[in-house]
Amino acid sequence: MSNTHNCNHDCENCENKCEEVEQGCNHDCDNCSHHCGGCGSKEDLLKPQNQYSEVKNVIAIMSGKGGVGKSMVTSLLASKLSKEGYQVGILDADITGPSIPKCFGIHERVAASSECIFPRESRDGVKVVSSNLLLENETDPIIWRGPVIAGLVQQFWTDVAWGDVDFLFVDMPPGTGDVPLTVFQSLPVKGVIVVTSPQDLVSMIVEKAVKMTEKMDIPVLGIVENMSYFVCPNCDEKHYIFGESNVEEVAVSYSIDTVSKMPIDGKLPALCDQGLVEAYDEDVLKAVINKIKKLA
């Protein structure tokens, strides 16, 4: 008997702790022999939106490791959908390494009232909330422990006046630690986009991320492989600088039907560095964007 749909994976607050918790629970309820049964449903942990927010679809962007361009992909997805007329927001959950504001050229701190926090908007109307927009000096480090970071991520959901938003992208830090777990437990995530790169080692790391979404019972909408190839400007031939990957094999093995491959294009990171990600006009994420639009 499966316990997946009756467990919210909140072992710390479980009223019926089992031996798995003492040994380090891996949240693999389907293969657990204990079936705690005292944790309640997954929905019990979801945090409510406030009265000033009507977010229709929450999409988490994750990667198994850093340095694959996850925040750049998040920014590009938000920008493209905004240009198509959708109301879009980005919750920057990478609290200690935020880069979303820089991609959009947003430097002004967020405003707040006694009731809520107001997101900043990009030139094209993408709403953004980030830890960097709380600091007096955006180069100051945030040196916090996990529970405090997780608490701020939840506040970005419960205390921000998001307004009417069709798609809220949650840009998560790399890995499968505290913040992804908090996001998957606290927010009504409709699906996940996994960002990766072509190196062999990455396929193993991608599988870790995909397996986490399976354990949390959240579908993977698609995989984005960044830096997949380089197009010669003289002959238009594709060159696989890092070798051809097996991302399609990984996708098939987990029944993921959507893969977008982004070329190495120096123009995109240069625009992000200038805060002009919305000026990038190449259509490199069409497959994933079309999959996301089906949620609307």
Task: Indicate residue ranges for each PLM-predicted region.
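Residue-level signature of catalytic and energy-coupling elements of molecular machines
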Residues: 55, 66, 92, 100, ...
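C-terminal lobe/tail of nucleotide-utilizing enzymes
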Residues: 2-43, 210-296
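Pre-Walker A adenine-sensing motif
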Residues: 44-52
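Phosphate-binding loop that captures ATP/GTP phosphates
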Residues: 87-88, 93-138, 143, 150
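Glycine-rich phosphate-binding loops of nucleotide-dependent enzymes
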Residues: 129, 172, 185, 291-294
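Phosphate-binding/switch loop-helix module in NTP-utilizing enzymes
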Residues: 135-183
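Inter-motif core of Ras-like GTPase G domains
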Residues: 161, 180-201
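Walker A/P-loop phosphate-binding motif and the immediately C-terminal alpha-helix
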Residues: 52, 57-94, 210
